[in-house]
From Swiss-Prot:
Keywords: Leucine-rich repeat, Repeat. The keyword Repeat applies. PANTHER family: PRAME FAMILY MEMBER 20, SIMILAR TO PREFERENTIALLY EXPRESSED ANTIGEN IN MELANOMA-LIKE 3. This is PRAME family member 20. Belongs to the PRAME family. GO terms for cellular component: Cul2-RING ubiquitin ligase complex; cytoplasm. LRR repeats lie at residues 97-124, 179-203, 204-230, 231-265, 266-291, 292-323, 324-342, 348-375, 376-400. GO terms for molecular function: ubiquitin-like ligase-substrate adaptor activity. InterPro entries: LRR_dom_sf (IPR032675), PRAME (IPR026271), PRAME_domain (IPR050694). GO terms for biological process: negative regulation of apoptotic process; negative regulation of cell differentiation; negative regulation of DNA-templated transcription; positive regulation of cell population proliferation; proteasome-mediated ubiquitin-dependent protein catabolic process.
Length: 475
């Protein structure tokens, strides 16, 4: 049975302050710095709004990390924080130790405040946590505005919730005093009309990561593209489920041109994810030619490409230093894989993650990529599931990974011989072939983690795995 440490005298004295209706800002100025985090938590959780307002005005650190306390935001407590900031911004209070420069509404670890409070009590909190320099966090901060608000936006409802509505209105009314910095923007379901209003409020060149997964049509994406081009510090772009059906070829060409030319302005882009994006077919070269930076990650998944698109992959210097290449779910059946071989040769010195799951690659195509694959010495993860290849081809593939000493995870398809004429996996045969293949691998090298996987089960949607024994699917 654990015994709770009794509160220290200083903590008890601090809590009594929160119950003092006549609490004055001058009293808080004399409060030891170490008491501010635990007392702020107490005031926030118990909704002592007047005390919160005063504590914000007397906050002795550069940054107020409010985000982790906003899991279940209370409008009254949030408004009290804003009222305290107003008093500072309008100089209604004069403080000897006004340090607060950043209101941080980003989502940090839930136990951040608890760890912070305990560390403060032990006098061991690193200065980097207490007084992290805000100038390092936002390229737009140059001391022009006294307060910066950091926020990550996830727009998944049709309209903004009360908390965001209150914040945006507050920022808009204090133009010139408050800089709103959004680094991460996720659009997962909101109507674009409402998204547009938000994009007009935030500083677009602060945004570093964008995810779009709203089932947009290509014309809606075209409406978004002018805003994308203003995100000059963008490092990561995720684009999913863009539908280009029901528009003429002329319109499609026009919209694709509008979108791809924005990449000319994105000179910090490092990670590009395109999932189920139908307009790439026949237009991949148009996008790649506009990339002006070297990507670390390129993911083109569940897309339809032409063979000519695959040929363009190895042409452009922007993908010559890839660490991650993910083409999973993009059908490459009946394509020549020589262009993929050329690309693998080009990125062999840097590639760490290669995913070719469910590409429809067959025996006759595999040999083309084996020489280049065997020279990807930095590879740590290789996934090749869902490709219908024979036992002999799979053995040949495994032999070409002998010298890849950095491999930590390998995922291979169950051999074609594991299935009956109806395409249903025969578990006993799969187990036998899995054991034989594992034995041959271990005779050549000691793999760290290797799995043989069946196709997806039509009943449960999972794969069966072989890792020394068969792990059945869930149905």
């Amino acid at each position: 049975m654990s015994i709770r440490t009794p509160p220290r005298l200083l903590e008890l004295a601090g809590r009594s302050l929160l119950r003092d209706e006549a609490l004055a800002i001058s009293t808080l100025e004399e409060l030891p710095t170490e008491l501010f985090p635990p007392l702020f938590m107490e005031a926030f959780s118990r909704r002592h709004c007047e005390a919160l307002k005063l504590m914000v005005q007397a906050w002795p650190f550069l940054r107020l990390p409010l985000g982790s306390l906003m899991k279940r935001p209370c409008p009254e407590t949030f408004q009290a924080v804003l009222d305290g900031l107003d008093a500072l911004l309008t100089h209604r209070v004069r403080l000897r130790r006004w340090k607060l420069q950043v209101l941080d509404l980003q989502d940090v670890s839930e136990n951040f405040w608890m760890v912070w409070s305990e560390a403060m009590a032990r006098r061991c909190l690193p200065n980097a946590m207490m007084n992290r320099k805000p100038l390092q966090d936002c390229p737009r901060m140059r001391g022009q505005q006294p307060l910066t608000v950091f926020i990550d936006l996830c727009l998944k409802n049709r309209t903004l919730d009360e908390y965001f509505t209150c914040l945006f209105l507050w920022v808009k009314q204090r133009e010139g005093l408050v800089h709103l910095c959004c680094k991460k923007l996720k659009m997962l379901g909101m109507l674009f009309h409402n998204i547009r209003n938000i994009l007009k409020t935030v500083n677009l060149d602060c945004i570093q990561e964008v995810e779009v997964n709203c089932n947009w049509t290509l014309p809606v994406l075209a409406e978004f593209t002018p805003y994308l081009g203003q995100m000059r510090n963008l490092r990561k772009l995720v684009l999913s489920d863009i539908d280009s059906r029901y528009i003429s070829p002329e319109q499609k060409k026009e919209f694709v041109t509008q979108f791809t030319t924005q990449f000319l302005k994105l000179r910090c882009l490092q990670k590009l994810y395109m999932n189920s994006v139908s307009f790439l077919e026949g237009h991949l070269d148009q996008m790649l030619s506009c990339l002006k930076t070297s990507l670390n990650i390129l993911a083109i998944t569940n897309c339809v490409l032409l063979e000519s698109d695959l040929k363009h992959l190895s042409k452009y210097p922007s993908i010559g230093q890839l660490k991650t290449l993910d083409l999973s779910g993009t059908r490459l059946a009946n394509f020549s894989l020589v262009p993929l071989q050329v690309l693998l040769e080009k990125v062999a010195a840097t590639l760490e993650y290669l995913d070719l799951d469910d590409c429809g690659i067959v025996d006759s195509q595999v040999n083309a990529i084996l020489p280049a694959l065997s020279r990807c010495f930095e590879l740590t993860t290789f996934s090749f599931r869902g490709n219908p290849i024979s036992t002999a081809t799979l053995e040949n593939l495994l032999c070409h990974t002998i010298r890849l000493n950095n491999l930590c995870l390998e995922l291979y398809p169950a051999p074609r011989e594991s299935y009956d004429v109806r395409g249903i996996v025969c578990r006993s045969r799969f187990a036998q072939l899995g054991a034989e293949l594992m034995g041959r691998v271990r005779a050549l090298r000691e793999p760290e983690r290797i799995l043989f996987c069946t196709d997806y089960c039509p009943q449960c949607g999972n794969r069966s795995l072989y890792d020394l024994e068969v792990d059945r699917c869930c149905c």
